[in-house]
From Swiss-Prot:
Gene Ontology cellular component list: cytosol
Catalyzed reaction equations: (1S,2R)-1-C-(indol-3-yl)glycerol 3-phosphate + L-serine = D-glyceraldehyde 3-phosphate + L-tryptophan + H2O
Annotated organism of origin: Staphylococcus epidermidis (strain ATCC 35984 / DSM 28319 / BCRC 17069 / CCUG 31568 / BM 3577 / RP62A)
Gene3D superfamilies, A to Z: Aldolase class I
This protein's name: Tryptophan synthase alpha chain
Pathway: Amino-acid biosynthesis; L-tryptophan biosynthesis; L-tryptophan from chorismate: step 5/5
Root EC class: lyase
Family of the protein in this entry: Belongs to the TrpA family.
CDD domains: Tryptophan_synthase_alpha (cd04724)
Annotated EC: 4.2.1.20
Species lineage: Bacteria, Bacillati, Bacillota, Bacilli, Bacillales
Assembly with partners or alone: Tetramer of two alpha and two beta chains.
Record keywords: Amino-acid biosynthesis, Aromatic amino acid biosynthesis, Lyase, Tryptophan biosynthesis
Record-linked NCBIfam families: trpA
Entries under PANTHER family matching the protein: TRYPTOPHAN SYNTHASE ALPHA CHAIN, CHLOROPLASTIC, TRYPTOPHAN SYNTHASE, ALPHA CHAIN
Amino acid sequence: MSKLFIPYIMGDLNFIHHLKTLTENGADIVEIGVPFSDPVADGPIIMKAGRNAIDEGSNIKFIFDELIKNKNTISSKYVLMTYYNILSAYGEELFLDKCDEAGVYGLIIPDLPYELTKKFKKDFYHHSVKIISLIAMTASDARIMQIAKNSEGFIYTVTMNATTGNSGEFHPDLKRKIEYIKKVSKIPVVAGFGIKNPEHVKDIASVADGIVIGSEIVKRIEIDSRKEFITYIKSIRTTLNSL
């Protein structure tokens, strides 16, 4: 199986354009951030993009409407990254109905603890959308096994004990943790948070089944030309294909 490339984009008014660009240039799954006023798990770059998206008028209704209109023209899978407040305010059942209608593959809910995630999946088992589990590098082996056993879609490992986009070294125990998670998991294990360049990708994806790139993608969408952006995306895809 080829390594998974999962870029993150903010769900702003142009997100469908960015989604299609990524899909056409090697993304396997695209993570779409739902803009939120208090994004506790986001670093400054994604936080700023979220504020801008809110200011220009984007919201979860707009995101669902655009996905429903365009789902048949998008070849990659896509997941929504949303805080529980948005889901709760929308109504859990209605939110998941819309996910099904919009072709959403999975949900990442970073502020929903594992115990509540397990209950959530049990309550809404009849929906096709998958609830993606996150595992921090600080989690014990027992905790990892517990989460992995009940995970679906893919497992998202947080490669640094920090918010997204934070520069610096990856956790020194990273590879051992990822290898252990893979050992106890029946689904792909991807790594994210802090990955920026092909060197990072080569290092992490030598053990992980794929990578998530968030802040670097969001930053490049803002500052790069379309040609530069596509060149960067292709460099990540090429690196993954070489492993």
